[in-house]
Amino acid sequence: LDADVALGIIEPVPQNTPTKWCARMVIVPKKDGTPRRTVDLQNLNKVTHRETHHTPSPFNIVSVVPPKKKKTVLDAWNGYHSVLLSPEARNATTFITEWGRYRYLRAPQGFHASSDGYTKRFDDITAGFPRLTRCVDDSLLWDNDIATSFWHTLSYIQLCGDSGIVFNPEKFRFAEDSVEFAGFEMTPTGYQPPQRLLKAIEDFPSPTNITGVRSWFGLVNHISFAFAQAPIMAPFRELLTKRQPFYWDTSLETLFQNSKAEIIRSIKNGVTTFEVNRPTCLATDWSRTGIGFTLSQKHCDCPDLDNPFCGGDHWRVTYAGSRFTRNAESRYAPIEGEALALLFGLESCRMFVLGCPKLIVAVDHKPLVQIFNDR
């Protein structure tokens, strides 16, 4: 408390000063064992409006980084605290301790508007800065060599420092070929879930209640949204429907273990970084239970550019996704279903396929091809 008062993050509430709001303080440990102070602002969150600011998904954030680059990662220290609170808003953040009441002078963690407000401010500060991608507190810069990385990084630190943003030196990574960023392990040629998350799936215990099923879905969704929606997860998804009682039998246990192995096998090698000038293939498919797509790029010297299935490791996956069909969609005619899958794939991959000079769309329904030929 004294350290944060000295830093201008919080201040004591003067005695005999009434406040309409007063929350409780909760102390939780950080990863390194040091204490972290949190304040329970749930009641305040219920009666205040949240500023919204669009943030791309982690996959979209990392997919803009070209392959074979030197990558520098910086982590903002207490980023929320770079946003000042107006004097009239401070009393609403009052919290009680054994040593009296305190209130925030800067945006607190746990307040639902802090994240979007801070992210918007950070985005405004860094708008137009070259070769940069960000994910909340984390920033990633990329360059061709170490010398360019040095001056590029120095310029970025100066820009942020002038606006009161401070970086954590313990999490600084300079001009490395492989780094962890936005939940992905980024290598010179692609990105994949870090091994600790794959280990978390492998060691995940069998659910014993609905909360366990939700936790399982949340972990899979964090690593791979496509697999959270894949047919192999359908039996677990049914357990989450309203008024569905929880049950767990040997067949579900077998499917649970098989799904863990399948997910790990399918995503442990990650995906290849998208390169706009490579031949690109979007393959889509529809069934009564779901729709899906894969976006692949050509990494061989085969003369046949129009054949996305020439075998081996020649075409490598850049992106993939799927979802369950809705009740009405499951009753579509095949040509309608295949068109739906194609639309889903194009919309999901729009940041890759818009303006792509060498795009091939592969479907397994001849009548759909004929419609496009007629047009």
Regions picked out by a protein language model, each given a short descriptive name:
Residues A283, S287-F309:
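Acidic, metal-ligating active-site segments
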Residues V28-G33, L44-E51, H81-P87, A127-V166, ...:
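Catalytic palm subdomain of template-directed nucleic-acid polymerases
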Residues L1-K120, L159, M186-Q229, Y332:
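Catalytic-core region of right-hand nucleic acid polymerases
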Residues F59-K69, R121-T126, V220, G337-C356:
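Metal-dependent nuclease catalytic cores in nucleic-acid-processing enzymes
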Residues N45, G100-G117, D301-L340, D364-R375:
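A short, polar/acidic, helix/strand-boundary loop motif
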Residues T72-A76, R278-S287, L342:
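Two-metal-ion RNase H-like nuclease active-site motif
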